[in-house]
Amino acid sequence: MESRSDDMKQQRHDVVIVGGGAAGLSGALTLARARRSVLVIDAGKPRNAPASHIHNYLGRESTPPGELLAIGRGEAAGYGAEIVEGRVASAERLPGEQGFRVATEDGRSVEARRLLVTTGLVDELPPVPGLAERWGREVLHCPYCHGHEVADRPIGVLATGGFAVHQALMWRQWSEDVTLFRHTGPEPTDAEYEELAARGVAVVDGEVTGLEVADDRFTGVRLAGGPVIPREALVVQARFVARSAVLESLGLVPVAQEMGGEVIGTYIPTDPTGATEVPGVWAAGNVTRLTEQVIGAAAAGLMAAGAINGDLIAEDTRNAVEARRRG
């Protein structure tokens, strides 16, 4: 993998970044350009790996996810950032103001003055056979990420909660042929039925038991009892679970995020710059903002990196003043 190795060249850095996606690499690029020593530890398991292209990224529209990461690694490494492959198991604060020690699952450790955690999230899909295999291809959740690519095609929406009606009405913007499959979701209210009917969204009762696939293409939804409803895309509500183990090892606790009165996942709270409740620790990207797209995650990495550099400058200045006073 370009600009990555298994070896850590030094054992202490200004900043260790856990996670090498858009947020982490953006933070690494910013900090390296600020002449900070930066180490990125990346497990190589990006959330958007199943997707064929990235969208809504100005200047990089329709870039394959792997290509964007390779470009980002090269850019960050070009300014001196070190990028290694590995999975971080935990982090701990060192005594005094010495920073943190980060431990990987394979037994390596490294120290840092500051931490930036950009570990993203995991999409937990409804327990319907076939969803995971088609995830990111024809099984979708974000209309802004995938809507244009399935425009004017037959689209299904799998209801597992009350948010499905909102999803169906939203995806109607991209296709006139939208069907809401009731599945295990609640029955729509009278007002919701009226809205769906007004927009021409069909509602089908019955549990979905699987997907029909032919020639490696999703072709329809199979209902209990055998009927198959032809569809070319299926929208689901995944549960977004922050990859927060590293942050939890430092004492941070993930909280539930609600949308439309439903819990859609968990995240780690931060301030607008990405600072967590643990001094010296920042988080950026989907681990703290569940609905962030790639370009937003990159922007969050930049924001956090700027705040981290400012914090380090303040510490460097305090240390310089103390040294001057000591003569």
Question: Model segments located where?
Answer:
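FAD-binding core/adjacent interface of flavoenzyme oxidoreductases
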Residues: 1-15, 83-153, 233, 263-273
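Beta1-alpha1 glycine-rich phosphate/pyrophosphate-binding loop at the start
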Residues: 13-70, 153-154, 163-187
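Short, well-ordered coil/turn residues at beta-beta hairpins
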Residues: 19, 112, 118-120, 125-127, ...
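A conserved FAD-binding loop/helix module that cradles the flavin
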Residues: 28-29, 165-167, 284-327
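Anion (oxyanion) recognition and catalysis
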Residues: 32, 77, 133, 172, ...
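A Rossmann-like FAD-binding core segment of flavoenzymes
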Residues: 70, 76-104, 109-112, 175-267, ...
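FAD-site-proximal beta/loop scaffold in flavoenzymes
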Residues: 133-149, 240-295
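Active-site glycine-rich loop that binds ribose-phosphate moieties when present
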Residues: 137-144, 157-167, 188-190
